[in-house]
């Protein structure tokens, strides 16, 4: 095959005639290719040279050309596949994607009068002022990347992630963190905050992004936006309106424009005047639209939080210097840490963020099992809680929501529930038309189901479909779960096409590990004591997926009153409680961390009174159905303490 590239390097115009040498020779697994270089030198004389170019681990090719020691240009061809992630850093090459002309045109519309090259310089200058990210040695890096399981990443997935779309459009050097269009004031604020002199000053909370007045966002669709993208935006808006106090009004005179540019990006917060949100080709995903709208509402990426180093390790080993400013961490003065750190947030980078081709991951979670969960595009329960807290959404009456849910400000008669739970008070199994309630025994039982849509075999759908199972077991038993086999799963960072999430931990509000890679099959996972029922939440947005998994219960040696969450989580919750910034009430804390909180044998309530958390009618039914004794004692006490008799005999 012949391909033609034109490269302008300094004084040279180099015409590259790409020749695949000796196609029938498969030595060294066809790792090397020959390139025939034809060019004119500085004196206008034609010259010619043939060079052998090594193939990189990701399928791309690396070449370097030097002219009189003044020119050093490195380019990588677009890779045709991805590879198994490795434990050490292989030879890498930065992907070089120049800003395309169409991307430049749409970017000019969004930059509010700032020339693209000036914005590029501003971001580069801001990056030089960023707080030093602790550098880790090669030995430390190798150890870090041995902490999590390596998987075979799916080759040629059905769609690119939004950050890959922007990278290939050449937008990375012109947008902050790959998709944020900062204004001059925000750049100045971040630069000031990152300087060592400013960091020594005690500062008050200073939001980088302004709120939308009246909690109303006015917008209109640019004439070039397709009906498909318009519907995707409407779907994202409908979801956000149904779960927050925010309102979006379509108005042709609005200055906030959603347009079909090149790439996926937006402004952050309410800026005043014309604002833009770009959803170009490759951005036709409901989660991507919601992600960019969330930026418009004032949210930054999760890994920018001031406390991020408690949850992830940043490894810049294979991140080009020009991209390292994207790993800026905010200070407590500007970081909005309103909910627990959420690995599965739709605002979190994946572990591959800004990594050179073939390099090691740039973000590694302290909880290694979460490495392939980061980078998801499903709006999580805590994402919704973050938005509602950020905009002070509330209801006149607070409902007694179960399983960590909270009153829905868009409909104060129901709760917003963690995935896996539904009903008015989050006490029922969410029915998506797929899934059922299963009863575990002490022997393995198997469940197989297929869901999705066979009509989209060529590309991924804009939105996912869900399936939800509950596994129940007798009181005092612990549920075990094992994935046996899968069909048509795409193993990618973020599990953006399909995945299964067994909710094993007692805190149902957080996104738990999602599995979309076969390397985790056959592993026996044990739920925390007291997790009963245990939801198994699964999703699909490409073709059809089949899951086969097994479940059973085992005896537990955990006492009735004990921590049901891991020690690190309980110590963190205890610290937050002591500092007066806990998002949980005393009853919730007892269910999760009774021993650490020293709540065993004590009435768990903020005001010292013992009462049912749910309405009397529901607790009466709860007791009649035998749930006071069938459920784990801590769970029964939490739900209906008075009706179940725990006021006189606390767990």
UniProtKB/Swiss-Prot annotation:
<keyword id="KW-0325">Glycoprotein</keyword>
<dbReference type="GO" id="GO:0018996">
    <property type="term" value="P:molting cycle, collagen and cuticulin-based cuticle"/>
</dbReference>
<feature type="domain" description="CUB">
    <location>
        <begin position="434"/>
        <end position="554"/>
    </location>
</feature>
<keyword id="KW-0964">Secreted</keyword>
<feature type="binding site">
    <location>
        <position position="301"/>
    </location>
    <ligand>
        <name>Zn(2+)</name>
    </ligand>
</feature>
<dbReference type="InterPro" id="IPR001506">
    <property type="entry name" value="Peptidase_M12A"/>
</dbReference>
<dbReference type="GO" id="GO:0004222">
    <property type="term" value="F:metalloendopeptidase activity"/>
</dbReference>
<feature type="disulfide bond">
    <location>
        <begin position="245"/>
        <end position="393"/>
    </location>
</feature>
<feature type="disulfide bond">
    <location>
        <begin position="434"/>
        <end position="467"/>
    </location>
</feature>
<dbReference type="InterPro" id="IPR017050">
    <property type="entry name" value="Metallopeptidase_nem"/>
</dbReference>
<keyword id="KW-0165">Cleavage on pair of basic residues</keyword>
<protein>
    <recommendedName>
        <fullName>Zinc metalloproteinase nas-32</fullName>
        <ecNumber>3.4.24.-</ecNumber>
    </recommendedName>
</protein>
<feature type="domain" description="Peptidase M12A">
    <location>
        <begin position="203"/>
        <end position="394"/>
    </location>
</feature>
<keyword id="KW-0862">Zinc</keyword>
<dbReference type="Pfam" id="PF01400">
    <property type="entry name" value="Astacin"/>
</dbReference>
<keyword id="KW-0479">Metal-binding</keyword>
<dbReference type="InterPro" id="IPR034035">
    <property type="entry name" value="Astacin-like_dom"/>
</dbReference>
<feature type="glycosylation site" description="N-linked (GlcNAc...) asparagine">
    <location>
        <position position="72"/>
    </location>
</feature>
<feature type="active site">
    <location>
        <position position="292"/>
    </location>
</feature>
<keyword id="KW-0378">Hydrolase</keyword>
<keyword id="KW-1015">Disulfide bond</keyword>
<feature type="disulfide bond">
    <location>
        <begin position="610"/>
        <end position="647"/>
    </location>
</feature>
<dbReference type="InterPro" id="IPR003582">
    <property type="entry name" value="ShKT_dom"/>
</dbReference>
<dbReference type="InterPro" id="IPR024079">
    <property type="entry name" value="MetalloPept_cat_dom_sf"/>
</dbReference>
<keyword id="KW-0645">Protease</keyword>
<keyword id="KW-0245">EGF-like domain</keyword>
<keyword id="KW-0482">Metalloprotease</keyword>
<feature type="disulfide bond">
    <location>
        <begin position="628"/>
        <end position="644"/>
    </location>
</feature>
<feature type="glycosylation site" description="N-linked (GlcNAc...) asparagine">
    <location>
        <position position="453"/>
    </location>
</feature>
<dbReference type="GO" id="GO:0005576">
    <property type="term" value="C:extracellular region"/>
</dbReference>
<feature type="disulfide bond">
    <location>
        <begin position="415"/>
        <end position="426"/>
    </location>
</feature>
<dbReference type="GO" id="GO:0006508">
    <property type="term" value="P:proteolysis"/>
</dbReference>
<feature type="domain" description="ShKT">
    <location>
        <begin position="610"/>
        <end position="647"/>
    </location>
</feature>
<feature type="disulfide bond">
    <location>
        <begin position="495"/>
        <end position="516"/>
    </location>
</feature>
<comment type="function">
    <text>Metalloprotease.</text>
</comment>
<feature type="binding site">
    <location>
        <position position="291"/>
    </location>
    <ligand>
        <name>Zn(2+)</name>
    </ligand>
</feature>
<dbReference type="GO" id="GO:0008270">
    <property type="term" value="F:zinc ion binding"/>
</dbReference>
<keyword id="KW-0732">Signal</keyword>
<feature type="glycosylation site" description="N-linked (GlcNAc...) asparagine">
    <location>
        <position position="557"/>
    </location>
</feature>
<keyword id="KW-0865">Zymogen</keyword>
<feature type="domain" description="EGF-like">
    <location>
        <begin position="380"/>
        <end position="433"/>
    </location>
</feature>
<feature type="disulfide bond">
    <location>
        <begin position="619"/>
        <end position="640"/>
    </location>
</feature>
